[in-house]
Structure formats: structure tokens, C-alpha cells
A protein has these predicted regions:
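N-terminal Rossmann-like NAD(P)+-binding domain of SDR-like oxidoreductases, especially those catalyzing
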Residues: 1-151
């Protein structure tokens, strides 16, 4: 099995992915999370596993990211500010995490030839009449002058 990087690995989805990869026999997993919206309690059950390395830090604060990632095979980039309320209350931090940190991860992974899986939010779909979405579903995306649509 491969060696994985999971940014945002202490969040709900990230921590679930960490546990699934461990169950499938991952050789090692590097979790990078600043715990701004994730929680150490989500990964507490795996922190003593010798295959886990946890770095409690903002991605943009890691100076040696290129060399840190160099021995890994695949990156799941899940780190992001989540929730409209959180984004509105932490605009600068959200921009740093959602844009600059993503850029830094992509550059480091490119420098090390590491494939990356990028994730997004359901917010990109806007609003639709039905709860079930298909590729043909018509959606409404509002103006960015309204806080609800600005992130």
C-alpha cells in the first residue's frame, strides 16, 4: 500500500479517510491540520499508530513542505475553512487556507511528482429545486455582493 498525505485530516471527512486507509494497509499517513475546524478527538484513536505522523500547523506556515512531502505517494488535499459562518468570521484566514495553502500544496506535490486529489464544497452547486442532483440539474448561483454567495 502507499504512503499518503492528508491535509485537513482531523476534519470529519479527513479523519474517516485516515481510518479507512489504515484499515486497507497504508504504509504511512502524514496528517496536516491546524485544528481550526477539525478536531484532534477525530483522530485520537489513531495517533498512537506508528504509521501516523500528525503535524498541527497551518500549511502556509510549514517552511520545508517540499522536502516534508518528498517521500509520499499520494496527497488528499482536504484542508479548507468550512461553513458560511466560519468563513464570514475569519475572512483572511479562510483566504489563506483555501487559496494560498492550496497553492502551496499543489506546488510541493508538483515538485515531488505526487498526484493530488482536490476536494470542494457542495456550495459550488448553488441552489436547486430538487434535493437530488444530476449533471443536468439547473442551479442558481447568487451575486457575490451577498455574503451568502461571496465565498
Amino acid at each position: 500500500m502507499k504512503k499518503f498525505i492528508i491535509t485537513g485530516g482531523a476534519g470529519f471527512i479527513g479523519s474517516t479517510l485516515v481510518k479507512a486507509l489504515l484499515e486497507k494497509g497504508a504504509e504511512s499517513i502524514l496528517i496536516i491540520d491546524d485544528l481550526s475546524t477539525g478536531s484532534e478527538s477525530n483522530i485520537s484513536s489513531v495517533l498512537n499508530d506508528e504509521r501516523i505522523e500528525f503535524i498541527n500547523s497551518r500549511i502556509e506556515d510549514i517552511d520545508n513542505l517540499d522536502s516534508l512531502l518528498s517521500s509520499y505517494d499520494f496527497c488528499y488535499h482536504l484542508a479548507a475553512g468550512v461553513g458560511v459562518q466560519y468563513i464570514m468570521e475569519n475572512l483572511s484566514d479562510s483566504l489563506l487556507t483555501n487559496i494560498l495553502a492550496t497553492h502551496k500544496v499543489l506546488e510541493s506535490c508538483q515538485a515531488n511528482n505526487i498526484p493530488v486529489l482536490l476536494t470542494s464544497t457542495s456550495e459550488v452547486y448553488g441552489v436547486a429545486e430538487d434535493d437530488i442532483w444530476t449533471e443536468d440539474t439547473k442551479s442558481l448561483i447568487g451575486p457575490t455582493t451577498k455574503l451568502r454567495w461571496s465565498y
